[in-house]
Each structure stands twice: as C-alpha cells, then as structure tokens.
Design a protein with these regions (language model features):
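Phosphate-binding site of ATP-dependent enzymes
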Residues: 132, 157-190
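Conserved N-proximal alpha/beta basic substrate-recognition cap immediately N-terminal to
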Residues: 11, 29-130, 142
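N-terminal-proximal low-complexity accessory segments that begin disordered
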Residues: 2-39
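A short acidic (Asp/Glu
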Residues: 16-24, 64-70, 145-148, 184-185
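Glycine-rich phosphate-binding loop of ATP-grasp-fold ATP-dependent ligases
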Residues: 113-116, 133-161, 183-185
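Short, surface-exposed loop and linker segments with low hydrophobicity and enrichment for Pro/Ser/Thr
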Residues: 1-5, 46-53, 129, 163-167
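Conserved glycosyltransferase catalytic-site signature
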Residues: 35-38, 145, 180-183
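Generic beta-sheet signal
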Residues: 5-7, 52-54, 134-136, 172
Length: 190
C-alpha cells in the first residue's frame, strides 16, 4: 500500500522550537499565513485508507501535540529523543560548528574573532566595546525575533533581552556587524 504524503506548512516552527513547550501558542501574526493557505484538519479527518507520511516544514513539540489531538497515531510521530535531536541541531551554535569545519577561507576574510558564543552579559558588553557595534542572536529563534542590532553599548532593553536569552537558552551569539550586501535564505530537506 502506497503512503500518502501530507505536507504541513508551519512557518511558526522556529518560534515553537525556540520556546520548547508543547503548549506554546505562537502569536497570531505567525499563524496567519499558514491558516490562509491550508486547512490541515480537513486532510487529517479523511478516512484512513492508506498510510500517511506527514512532512512538516519542521517538527516541534507543539506540532506533535496538535497532530496527536487531531487523531494521528502517536506511534507515527517523532519520539522525544528525535525532537530533542532536532532542537539541538537547530541551534545557531551547531550551524557555527558546521560552518567552521566547512570553510577555512572565511577566517582569512572575516577573521577568527568576528563572533563569540557568550554565556554572560559581561562577555557581550566586552565584545561590543571592542567592536563598536554587534549583532546579537539567540541560539534558537524565528521570524527575526531573535536578532538585535547594537551600537556602542547595550541599552536597558538589550540587556534585559540578553539576560532572558541567557537564562532560557544558555548563550547569545555575538557577531561584529558588517555592511549587508545581499540577504538570502535556503531550505533543505534531509
């Protein structure tokens, strides 16, 4: 019996994975686009005449719970270990590690000290002080909510954001700010 593939466009995935709680409810703004373009419940309520392979934009605890509540057999959904693997490998630190292994020429262009993985506010402040400006990135984030641009020093708001991010996610990626020439993004299916 051939399996039916159900693709789920869940653009709120990054916010859900950053939050980590299966009961997290993303902001309405993050959900609107997906809701305008697909009615998931209609696909899931059809008689189960064939096996279904669910292929989301990204797996997270919120989606797993939502699908289980819609009647999908929990045995066909990712395990806790698989979800933790996805969360760990979705962190910016993982991408930085992979990047450092793939590109030896970049260190000649941008220098080995253009970014740090900070675990304290004082590390962040020292980096900004040494570089005049910086981009602060939370290890897990989505929809641009985990990126802040800072010039000269942390504002009260920036410092509060750093403390909350350090408390919840354990680190903040701090990079020298460069002039943006072009922005692009890619999506891979593995």
């Amino acid at each position: 019996m051939q399996s039916e593939q159900i693709y789920i466009f869940n653009p709120e995935h990054d916010l859900c994975i950053a939050n980590g709680d299966e009961n997290f409810v993303p902001p309405r703004s993050a959900m609107g686009f997906a809701e305008e373009n697909i009615d998931l419940s209609e696909h899931l309520k059809r008689p189960n005449k064939q096996r279904r392979q669910i292929i989301p934009w990204g797996w997270n605890h919120s989606l797993k719970k939502r699908l289980a509540n819609e009647g999908i057999d929990p045995a066909t959904l990712p395990s806790e270990e698989e979800l933790q693997f996805i969360r760990t490998h979705s962190r910016r630190e993982f991408a930085l590690d992979v990047h450092s292994r793939l590109s030896c020429r970049d260190s000649q262009v941008i220098g080995p000290d253009y970014r740090i993985v900070a675990t304290s506010v004082s590390e962040i402040e020292d980096f900004i002080s040494a570089n005049d400006s910086a981009v602060l990135k939370s290890p897990l984030s989505g929809s641009g909510k985990g990126i802040r641009f800072v010039r000269e020093k942390l504002s009260e708001s920036d410092e509060g954001w750093c403390r909350r991010t350090l408390d919840k996610q354990g680190s903040v990626i701090v990079e020298r700010r460069f002039e943006i020439m072009k922005e692009c993004a890619m999506l891979f299916e593995c």
